[in-house]
């Protein structure tokens, strides 16, 4: 497709209409590169994608994609073994999260049958392990403390040191208030300093870092905090080094998956682009045109996309029809009609919806040529006629039977008689070459050419003689007429002058009467068609209303189901939590034996309200619908026996699943858990406690990992963990506390010594963690 036609018809302005609907930089790049296609299968595929997106919006009105930055350059840097910065990693994290969201969204789609988009959704891949690691990068582009134990240690020390410095300086603010120009702690070169009056600079021992512009204030770092500030400086350097190490580790994690991540990013961008095309179609009442197998064109109520209030027109360019000649005076909208045809064809061949009604049809041309407007070249000293003729010669040399040619005011700019003859000769050459052509002209001679020549049709633009203004309605099959006599009469020209003028052109009066009759017949036909279209629109509105009511009912039903499940779970959780509290108090007060606690707990658990939903037909139907989809890695689940939430991490060869439930890794069969709906992820989650799956003696021991925890948090988790282990009759458990500063390890030891249900405990063997882990025997 030649690029000049894109400039002449302002195709880039059409693309700008799509831009506001795009959310991702990838889709913006795809839009900027969009050009008309010349292969029907590719165009058909683009149209099928829009149809698929329409189905999605019928089921999910608010379907959308989060804003995503382009990651193409970041992925190239990874391939070159470079490390990414925090913002680049955050952009990739968003792509991974969005990919996972799209996969879950697709898996939950009901009542949708795709033609093209299914392959995109199915080619998306998710990375649960990578997503888990990247939780250490928050949405603000900051590394969280838990990114590594070392980073947490450094930041904890940094916080403590900064607190001590502030405390010392706060005390000095009170003690030395009379020596200070301001009662505040300032900062100079990253060091905490005090603003001291210059006259008292020798009263405070320390390091001078700055002097105010007036010289009245000296910024001194008191000697009491110099060492601490040095420590803070070193800790900040350590923090930067550890952050760089973590970013390097994250970059290494991503490197093996660059190709897949790039493909995911492209798919997300393309889905966003298809979504934008659908929204453009919906907002502008556009349509997906059919693609003709020949050169047939049929545009129903087609509109110019760049005009604010365009008039809709019908245009039919049948296979046998070679040329349409629009005749009549200027200012009637002939050029607009010419451009409307060209833009509709460019949009359709670019895979964009066309501003027309359903049933419209486009052809597929290898090239579209146009000579529109005054393109004379001052530099080449060419007249208007010479400029047009130079361009026309170029078009005639390049056009073939797979081309569409558009001429505006063909033959203008020279002697009318010669110009009309040239116009007819050019049209005849194109007709004999079987090249589809639309041309506008004000030469009356071309009316006769259109009537007398096979496969050529006249057309005109309607003119309202009452208001003396054009209506911009296209009348195919009706030649144009000047309406000069009617206009002159209505403007007050003497009747005898008008009569004399008519007598001078008597030879044309019969033709004008015929044209007038054709116009009347065309208007009557159009009125009837408009009435039929109104009835069709009423039917469409009714169908949409019914479909909307059905979707609203389905949505409300789903909300009620979720509410019922949530309320039932809250009742059970509340009862179990109360029982835990009661047993803990009994244990603290009465020295109950472990088996007595377990028996009592089991009895109280039986008292938890049981919500019998087995006879609820709506819930049973919902369960069947949910069960229709098999679980996948990354799915959120609820363990049926404990009511705890977790995530599926892998599937074993025997069909069982491994799941991470809090701090515990569990092996489950499919009937031991239920999938959590994606929508439930947005709900406020009930408070959960860590649980231990009951294991037989031959299975792996339960393990609690306290590394990276605060002391109070670690002790609380340890207490809950031992309690759950006793409840599940576990004989031995592992406690991983690390070595670190030894605070957590010492706390674990103290707790185990005073717990009467701990039979024995000792550090793990050297090859199993050594002094960083403790093996506990319960009894």
Curated annotation (Swiss-Prot):
Originating gene: mutS2
Transmembrane segments: none
Native organism: Streptococcus agalactiae serotype V (strain ATCC BAA-611 / 2603 V/R)
Sites where the protein binds ATP: 328-335
Disulfide bond sites: none
GO molecular function list: ATP binding; ATP hydrolysis activity; ATP-dependent DNA damage sensor activity; endonuclease activity; mismatched DNA binding; ribosomal large subunit binding; rRNA binding
Function: Endonuclease that is involved in the suppression of homologous recombination and thus may have a key role in the control of bacterial genetic diversity.
GO biological process, one term: mismatch repair
Enzyme Commission number(s) from the entry: 3.1.-.-, 3.6.4.-
Keyword set includes Membrane: no
Stated name of the protein: Endonuclease MutS2
Family according to the record: Belongs to the DNA mismatch repair MutS family. MutS2 subfamily.
All copies of domain Smr, residue ranges: 704-779
Keywords for the protein's UniProt record, in alphabetical order: ATP-binding, DNA-binding, Endonuclease, Hydrolase, Nuclease, Nucleotide-binding, RNA-binding, rRNA-binding
Higher taxonomy: Bacteria, Bacillati, Bacillota, Bacilli, Lactobacillales
Quaternary structure note: Homodimer. Binds to stalled ribosomes, contacting rRNA.
């Amino acid at each position: 497709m030649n690029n000049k036609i894109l400039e002449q018809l302002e195709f880039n302005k059409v693309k700008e209409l799509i831009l506001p609907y795009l959310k991702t930089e990838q889709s913006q790049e795809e839009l900027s590169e969009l050009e008309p296609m010349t292969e029907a299968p590719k165009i058909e595929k683009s149209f099928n994608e829009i149809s698929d997106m329409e189905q999605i919006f019928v089921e999910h009105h608010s379907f959308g994609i989060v804003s995503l930055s382009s990651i193409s350059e970041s992925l190239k840097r990874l391939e070159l073994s470079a490390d990414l910065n925090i913002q680049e990693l955050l952009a990739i994290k968003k792509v991974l999260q969005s990919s996972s969201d799209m996969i879950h969204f697709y898996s939950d789609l009901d009542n949708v049958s795709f033609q093209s988009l299914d392959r995109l959704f199915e080619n998306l891949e998710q990375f649960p392990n990578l997503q888990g690691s990247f939780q250490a990068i928050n949405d603000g582009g900051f590394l969280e403390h838990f990114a590594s134990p070392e980073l947490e240690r450094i930041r904890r020390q940094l916080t403590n040191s900064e607190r001590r410095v502030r405390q010392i300086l706060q005390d000095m603010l009170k003690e030395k208030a009379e020596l200070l120009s301001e009662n505040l702690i300032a900062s100079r070169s990253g060091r905490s300093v005090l603003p001291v009056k210059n006259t008292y600079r020798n009263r405070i021992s320390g390091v001078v870092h700055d002097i105010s512009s007036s010289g009245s204030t000296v910024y001194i770092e008191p000697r009491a905090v110099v060492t601490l500030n040095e420590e803070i400086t070193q800790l900040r350097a350590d923090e930067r080094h550890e952050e760089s190490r973590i970013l390097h580790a994250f970059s290494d994690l991503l490197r093996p998956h660059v190709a897949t991540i790039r493909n995911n990013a492209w798919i997300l961008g393309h889905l966003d682009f298809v979504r934008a095309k659908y929204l453009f179609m919906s907002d502008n009442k556009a349509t997906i045109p059919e693609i003709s197998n020949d050169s047939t064109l049929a545009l129903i109520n087609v509109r110019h996309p760049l005009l604010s209030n365009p008039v809709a027109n019908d245009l039919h360019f049948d296979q046998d029809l070679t040329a349409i000649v629009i005749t009549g005076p200027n200012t009637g909208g002939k050029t607009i009609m010419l451009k409307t045809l060209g833009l509709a064809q460019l949009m359709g061949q670019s895979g964009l919806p066309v501003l027309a009604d359903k049933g419209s049809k486009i052809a597929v041309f290898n090239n579209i040529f146009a000579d529109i407007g005054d393109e004379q070249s001052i530099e080449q000293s060419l007249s208007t006629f010479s400029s047009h003729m130079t361009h026309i010669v170029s078009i005639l040399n390049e056009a073939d039977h797979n081309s569409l040619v558009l001429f505006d005011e063909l033959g203008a700019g020279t002697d009318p008689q010669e110009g009309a003859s040239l116009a007819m000769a050019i049209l005849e050459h194109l007709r004999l070459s079987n090249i589809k052509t639309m041309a506008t002209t004000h030469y009356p001679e071309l009316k006769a050419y259109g009537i007398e020549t096979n496969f050529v049709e006249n057309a005109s633009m309607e003119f309202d003689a009452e208001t003396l203004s054009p209506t911009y309605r296209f009348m195919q099959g009706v030649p144009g007429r000047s309406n000069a006599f009617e206009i002159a009469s209505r403007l007050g020209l003497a009747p005898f002058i008008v009569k004399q003028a008519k007598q001078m052109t008597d030879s044309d009066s019969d033709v004008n009467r015929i044209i007038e009759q054709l116009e009347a017949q065309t208007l009557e036909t159009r009125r009837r068609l408009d009435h039929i279209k109104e009835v069709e629109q009423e039917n469409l509105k009714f169908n949409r209303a019914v479909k909307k009511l059905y979707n609203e009912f389905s949505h409300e039903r789903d909300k009620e189901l979720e509410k019922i499940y949530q309320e039932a779970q809250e009742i059970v959780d509340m009862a179990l939590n109360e029982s835990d509290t009661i047993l803990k108090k009994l244990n603290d007060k009465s020295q109950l034996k472990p088996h007595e606690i377990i028996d009592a707990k089991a009895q109280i658990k039986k008292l938890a309200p049981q919500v019998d939903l087995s006879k609820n037909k709506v819930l049973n139907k919902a369960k069947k619908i949910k069960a229709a989809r098999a679980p996948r890695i990354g799915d959120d689940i609820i363990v049926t026996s404990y009511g705890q939430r977790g995530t599926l991490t892998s599937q074993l060869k025997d069909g069982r699943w491994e799941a991470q439930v809090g701090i515990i890794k569990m092996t489950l069969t499919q009937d031991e858990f239920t999938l959590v709906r994606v929508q439930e992820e947005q709900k406020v989650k009930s408070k959960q406690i860590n649980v231990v799956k009951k294991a037989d003696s031959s299975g792996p021991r339960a393990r609690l990992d306290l590394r990276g925890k605060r002391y109070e948090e670690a002790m609380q988790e340890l207490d809950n963990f031992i309690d759950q282990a006793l409840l599940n009759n576990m004989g031995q458990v592992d406690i991983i506390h690390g070595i670190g500063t030894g605070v957590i390890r010492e706390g674990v030891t103290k707790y185990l010594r005073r717990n009467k249900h701990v039979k024995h405990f000792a550090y793990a063997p050297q090859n199993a963690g050594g002094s960083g882990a403790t093996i506990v025997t319960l009894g």
